A protein has these predicted regions:
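Recognition helix of helix-turn-helix/homeodomain-like DNA-binding domains
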Residues: 1-17, 39-41
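HKD-type phospholipase D/PLD-like phosphodiesterase module
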Residues: 121, 126-171
Length: 229
């Protein structure tokens, strides 16, 4: 959260404020997010999050990934201030549906954001198995290969770190600063049809830590992508 972000809030009363930024601002000012943005936050939810961080929490859940608006994905990545961590198998939708997705990552890296991108290795047993489980055969392999080929020319770009992994993914995660989009994977169902949770670090620190630890374990065992082009 920086001065530019606060200015956007002041200039546009209907600006969609990210959960983590709203709670951070409320903590600094000694109030609740509802006090600052009554149209975006319910009183009970805001107080529950502020006073009971270790108990049940309220987060945004979508029944499928396709229900999360494209604009929400775009703003999620565009707002990055310190770090972006992406853990996926193929995620070709990022390149196909988010206008200028790669440019957004490159711009973030150029301004000092540390970007880490974990993409599935198309030539591994885990990728082949996922295609069999989803009933689409080699389509998953082709998608992984497409994403790798799109990323490869940018491997080695300062601030943009890309690695390939061979793990079985139970969740795909898209962390930007203190907000994470979590795409669960249900057996036999493609990612686009599976639930998505939008989670703030402040919602449930233990769950956040578990997801971060999973990313770290996969990152440590992954292989750096070799630059092409």
């Amino acid at each position: 959260m920086d001065v530019k972000t606060v200015r956007r809030w002041l200039a546009n009363a209907t600006y969609k404020v990210r959960d983590d930024n709203a709670h951070r601002a409320a903590e600094v000012l000694g109030c609740t997010p509802h006090d600052l943005w009554p149209n975006q936050f319910q009183p009970s939810t805001a107080r529950a999050l502020a006073t009971n961080p270790g108990g049940p929490f309220t987060a945004t859940l979508y029944a499928s990934r396709t229900q999360l608006p494209i604009t929400a994905w775009q703003q999620h990545f565009a707002d990055a201030a310190t770090g972006i961590d992406i853990l996926v198998l193929a995620a070709t939708f990022l390149f196909d549906t988010l206008d200028g997705f790669l440019d957004t990552l490159l711009a973030a890296a150029a301004r000092g954001v540390q970007v880490r991108f974990l993409i599935g290795d198309p030539d591994t047993a885990a990728t082949i198995l996922r295609g069999e489980e989803e009933g689409i055969g080699e389509a998953v392999i082709a998608r992984c290969r497409t994403s790798v080929e799109l990323l490869a020319p940018h491997a080695g770009t300062p601030g943009l770190h890309i690695r390939t992994h061979d793990t079985t993914l139970y969740t795909s995660t898209f962390r930007v600063d203190d907000t994470m989009i979590v795409n669960f994977h249900i057996y036999g169902s493609p990612g686009r049809n599976n639930p998505v949770l939008v989670l703030s670090r402040h919602h449930e620190p233990r769950l956040w830590a578990t997801l971060e630890q999973a990313f770290a374990h996969i990152w440590d065992s992954a292989n750096p992508l070799i630059r092409k082009g």
